[in-house]
């Protein structure tokens, strides 16, 4: 029997603000000593009154616009009531009936081609504290994270496979980091995912029971957790066992999902409007201001790179994966064009040597770009195009410029990387190679045309790649002919 899989994701993304969602405490909790970025509001003390963070709301609205959502003019903050040790007030300020952003969609590469994943909502809420488990079986609570601004991005159940879920999660992360609303750091918990999945026999119209997998913090784990859970549910259905709506956790060590609790329903949280925060009313003018903040998004820029710069779809995709790289490429193209260097030539350096050196050094593109000025790329290519240096020397000059942050032209001059052209120096090297390889020379004279390639390689090796290969071949042929005539 065939089975249909239905998946929806809830992405929890911390909003990049200096202060928390409803108080003035610092939202930068990563390296702070436990419970030092706290106050009566985020500790949930009686009588403490919250104040919404304007910038957090602006960035959440910006996110909604980037995800093709409609921004609600009236927003209500609600209390989501439940008890857990990391929730000091006994409720979480969130949104229920009146979220900030509704509808929307994200386009991904689906299993059968381009596919739109529809969104239900994007709403704002506050993060919880963090439990720290000790070796003796106890648990401690750090409330520095409590109250940090958070967005929940909820998709409709449009995802059909674990692979699509991974691509959707990756696409969302790309957009959030691109527009500057989230760090994209999943290891620290700044971006995490809850996955809802149900399985039903093919032909059955009614969805199967929904199982939620909580707090997944990597693309690989999303795919693996869903693949396991789908297989678990199919095995249960084949055995005639019911699937119970529940919450499970992903155990990365065993590669399995683990039962945590029976799944709650919305009614269990007893949502009601936050009495200390009146409804937020957003005007059309305010929404237009947020729309004006929106940068060119990755998909639009990728298409423009193909059409304007003549890049392949692959190169355009690579160069729009991160905004830092994409902006750097455009700066490099603008500088290179003044030297007659083509955008494709700039792209080749970035997707080749630049990325190789980033991987080798472990640097971020933003850090490397501060040293490797964008105009250096066109400078290297111009020297290569004008025959001043060979491809080998160009790579050496590029790497030196990357590591040292100095002009490639200066490096070429200092290291003597300029091409060794026709002349006495090249002739002397050619004669040395001919004298040192009598067997190869004899093969060449017997008609083995490929033998000269070996001789060319030896000359290039002796010049450290600085000679022009065409000039080397011409010098070799002339010298071999001269020696032949002298015999």
Curated annotation (Swiss-Prot):
<dbReference type="InterPro" id="IPR004413">
    <property type="entry name" value="GatB"/>
</dbReference>
<keyword id="KW-0648">Protein biosynthesis</keyword>
<dbReference type="GO" id="GO:0050566">
    <property type="term" value="F:asparaginyl-tRNA synthase (glutamine-hydrolyzing) activity"/>
</dbReference>
<dbReference type="InterPro" id="IPR003789">
    <property type="entry name" value="Asn/Gln_tRNA_amidoTrase-B-like"/>
</dbReference>
<dbReference type="InterPro" id="IPR014746">
    <property type="entry name" value="Gln_synth/guanido_kin_cat_dom"/>
</dbReference>
<dbReference type="InterPro" id="IPR018027">
    <property type="entry name" value="Asn/Gln_amidotransferase"/>
</dbReference>
<dbReference type="InterPro" id="IPR017958">
    <property type="entry name" value="Gln-tRNA_amidoTrfase_suB_CS"/>
</dbReference>
<comment type="subunit">
    <text>Heterotrimer of A, B and C subunits.</text>
</comment>
<comment type="similarity">
    <text>Belongs to the GatB/GatE family. GatB subfamily.</text>
</comment>
<keyword id="KW-0436">Ligase</keyword>
<dbReference type="GO" id="GO:0050567">
    <property type="term" value="F:glutaminyl-tRNA synthase (glutamine-hydrolyzing) activity"/>
</dbReference>
<dbReference type="GO" id="GO:0070681">
    <property type="term" value="P:glutaminyl-tRNAGln biosynthesis via transamidation"/>
</dbReference>
<dbReference type="Pfam" id="PF02637">
    <property type="entry name" value="GatB_Yqey"/>
</dbReference>
<keyword id="KW-0067">ATP-binding</keyword>
<dbReference type="InterPro" id="IPR006075">
    <property type="entry name" value="Asn/Gln-tRNA_Trfase_suB/E_cat"/>
</dbReference>
<keyword id="KW-0547">Nucleotide-binding</keyword>
<dbReference type="Pfam" id="PF02934">
    <property type="entry name" value="GatB_N"/>
</dbReference>
<dbReference type="GO" id="GO:0005524">
    <property type="term" value="F:ATP binding"/>
</dbReference>
<dbReference type="InterPro" id="IPR023168">
    <property type="entry name" value="GatB_Yqey_C_2"/>
</dbReference>
<protein>
    <recommendedName>
        <fullName>Aspartyl/glutamyl-tRNA(Asn/Gln) amidotransferase subunit B</fullName>
        <ecNumber>6.3.5.-</ecNumber>
    </recommendedName>
</protein>
<dbReference type="InterPro" id="IPR042114">
    <property type="entry name" value="GatB_C_1"/>
</dbReference>
<dbReference type="GO" id="GO:0006412">
    <property type="term" value="P:translation"/>
</dbReference>
<comment type="function">
    <text>Allows the formation of correctly charged Asn-tRNA(Asn) or Gln-tRNA(Gln) through the transamidation of misacylated Asp-tRNA(Asn) or Glu-tRNA(Gln) in organisms which lack either or both of asparaginyl-tRNA or glutaminyl-tRNA synthetases. The reaction takes place in the presence of glutamine and ATP through an activated phospho-Asp-tRNA(Asn) or phospho-Glu-tRNA(Gln).</text>
</comment>
<dbReference type="InterPro" id="IPR017959">
    <property type="entry name" value="Asn/Gln-tRNA_amidoTrfase_suB/E"/>
</dbReference>
């Amino acid at each position: 029997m065939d089975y249909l899989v239905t998946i929806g994701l809830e992405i929890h993304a911390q909003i990049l603000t200096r202060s928390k969602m409803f108080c003035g405490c610092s939202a930068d909790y990563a390296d702070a000593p436990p419970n030092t970025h706290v106050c009566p509001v985020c500790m949930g003390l009686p009588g403490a009154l919250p104040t919404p963070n304007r910038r957090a709301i602006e960035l959440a609205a910006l996110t909604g616009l980037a995800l093709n959502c409609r921004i609600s003019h009236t927003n209500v903050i609600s209390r989501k009531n439940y008890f857990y040790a990391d929730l000091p007030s006994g409720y979480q300020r969130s949104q229920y009936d009146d979220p900030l952003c509704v509808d929307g969609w994200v386009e991904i590469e689906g299993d059968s081609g381009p596919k739109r994943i529809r969104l239900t909502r994007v709403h704002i809420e506050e993060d919880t504290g963090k439990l720290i488990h000790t070796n003796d079986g106890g648990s401690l609570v750090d409330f520095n994270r409590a109250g940090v601004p958070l967005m929940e991005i909820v998709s409709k159940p449009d995802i059909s496979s674990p692979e699509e879920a991974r691509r959707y999660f990756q696409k969302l992360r790309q957009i959030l980091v691109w527009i500057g609303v989230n760090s994209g750091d999943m290891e620290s918990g700044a971006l995490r995912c809850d996955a809802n999945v149900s399985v039903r026999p093919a032909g059955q119209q009614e969805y199967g029971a929904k199982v939620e997998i909580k707090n997944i913090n990597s693309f690989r784990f999303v795919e693996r957790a869903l693949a396991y859970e789908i297989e678990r549910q199919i095995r249960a259905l084949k055995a005639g066992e019911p699937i119970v709506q529940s919450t499970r956790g992903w155990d990365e060590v065993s590669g399995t999902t683990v039962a945590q609790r029976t799944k709650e329903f919305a009614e269990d949280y007893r949502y009601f409007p936050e009495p200390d925060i009146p409804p937020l009313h957003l005007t059309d003018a305010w929404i237009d201001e947020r729309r004006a903040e929106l940068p060119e998004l990755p998909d639009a820029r990728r298409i423009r790179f193909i059409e304007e710069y003549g890049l392949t779809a692959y190169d355009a995709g690579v160069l729009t994966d991160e905004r830092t790289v994409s902006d750097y490429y455009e700066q490099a193209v603008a500088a290179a064009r003044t030297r007659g260097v083509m955008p494709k030539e700039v792209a080749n350096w970035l997707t080749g040597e630049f990325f190789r050196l980033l991987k080798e050094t472990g640097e971020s593109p933003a850090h490397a770009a501060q040293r490797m000025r964008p105009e250096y790329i066109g400078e290297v290519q111009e020297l290569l195009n004008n025959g001043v240096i060979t491809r080998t020397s160009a790579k050496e000059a590029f790497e030196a410029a990357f590591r040292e942050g100095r002009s490639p032209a200066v490096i070429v001059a200092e290291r003597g990387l300029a091409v060794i052209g026709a002349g006495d120096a090249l002739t002397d090297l050619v004669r040395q190679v001919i004298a040192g390889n009598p067997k190869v020379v004899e093969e060449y004279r017997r008609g083995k045309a490929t033998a000269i390639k070996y001789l060319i390689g030896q000359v290039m090796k002796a010049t450290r790649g600085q000679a022009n290969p065409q000039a080397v071949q011409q010098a070799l042929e002339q010298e071999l002919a001269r020696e032949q005539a002298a015999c």
